Design a protein with these regions (language model features):
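ABC ATP-binding cassette signature C-motif
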Residues: 1-162
Length: 162
């Protein structure tokens, strides 16, 4: 619920308060890659419809996420890792300055998870992730622990190291 809460999801119930910086624009990456609105459309079609990107600029942004070779493929035919990278790209194009990733490597094979991690490494904003993937956390610099009492603590290392 934490990620949905800070993404602005009004259906999440919580007590207390939080405030994001004035220039923080959160973008939520759901645990599932279910996007019925993407079905039947190629990556180029989606980039044109949502961001008016013509062929050259569209291929350029797809190349940054190592999915330019899939430009003409339908979203549904992409691997899990390719779908994840495309979704991160869309969040970036939407102006998100803080990515909220809910189990981003869940159901990805190792190669797909590595590709996603590589793409996130090039992202210039803040990345907040909820994950149970020990491998994925190795590049993180800060860890938050959610206690049973509802309090949030910062830790110098991931909790599964304790």
């Amino acid at each position: 619920h934490f990620l949905r809460m800070i993404s602005g999801d009004k259906s999440v119930k919580y007590t207390g308060e939080f405030k994001l910086g004035a220039r923080v624009n959160p973008g939520y990456f759901a645990q599932t890659h279910s996007h019925p609105e993407f079905m039947g459309k190629t990556l180029l079609e989606l980039l044109w419809e949502n961001y008016s990107l013509q062929l050259g600029p569209a291929k350029s942004v797809l190349r940054r996420y190592e999915i330019d070779q899939q430009a003409e493929q339908k979203f549904s035919s992409l691997s899990g890792g390719q779908q994840a990278r495309f979704q991160v790209l869309l969040l970036e194009l939407s102006g998100s300055t803080m990515l909220l990733l809910d189990e981003p490597t869940d159901n990805l094979d190792l190669a797909s998870a590595e590709s996603l991690e590589h793409a996130l490494g090039r992202y210039e904003g803040t990345v907040v992730s909820v994950t149970h993937d020990r491998w994925f956390t190795r590049g993180f610099t800060r860890y938050l622990i959610f206690g049973a009492n509802g309090k949030v603590y910062e830790s110098p290392e991931p909790i599964f190291e304790h």
